[in-house]
């Protein structure tokens, strides 16, 4: 399966996960990466929160261009949404990171990897408010 098809499949998986939760709905922005205008992969909400989510998936480390993060910030601010990066690595559940918790690459770009999402990310259930995980210092 091509990485583009896999990414689209996982975006749809996350889309359906939100719809299965009572009170949550959303939409997938088709072709979000092919426009010059800021557009996240998913926009979801529950009447009190709106999330703009850029999805990343794969086997290991994923690099994220500074421009993509900047566009997510712009969109979220204009739309009144919280900006999040959703990450689904092979054999791992979805994890979500706030933009300030992304890893910094050389230059001005960012990255996510499995170690980073486990240490700095939150799981789907925490994102939607089912529980709040306490972290040990």
Residues of each region from the PLM?
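Active-site metal-binding core of divalent-cation-utilizing nuclease and nuclease-like domains
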Residues: 25-47
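Acidic-basic catalytic patches of nuclease active cores, encompassing PD-(D/E)XK
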Residues: 1-31
């Amino acid at each position: 399966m091509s990485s583009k098809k896999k990414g689209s499949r996982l975006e749809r998986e996350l889309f359906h996960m939100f719809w299965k939760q009572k009170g949550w709905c959303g939409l997938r922005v088709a072709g979000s990466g092919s426009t010059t205008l800021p557009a996240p992969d998913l926009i979801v909400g529950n009447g009190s929160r709106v999330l703009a989510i850029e999805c990343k998936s794969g086997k290991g480390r994923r690099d994220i261009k500074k421009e993509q993060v900047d566009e997510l910030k712009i969109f979220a601010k204009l739309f009144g949404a919280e900006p999040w990066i959703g990450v689904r690595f092979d054999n791992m559940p979805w994890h979500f990171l706030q933009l300030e918790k992304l890893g910094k690459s050389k230059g001005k770009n960012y990255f996510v990897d499995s170690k980073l999402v486990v240490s700095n990310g939150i799981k789907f259930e925490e994102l939607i408010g089912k529980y709040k995980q306490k972290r040990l210092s």
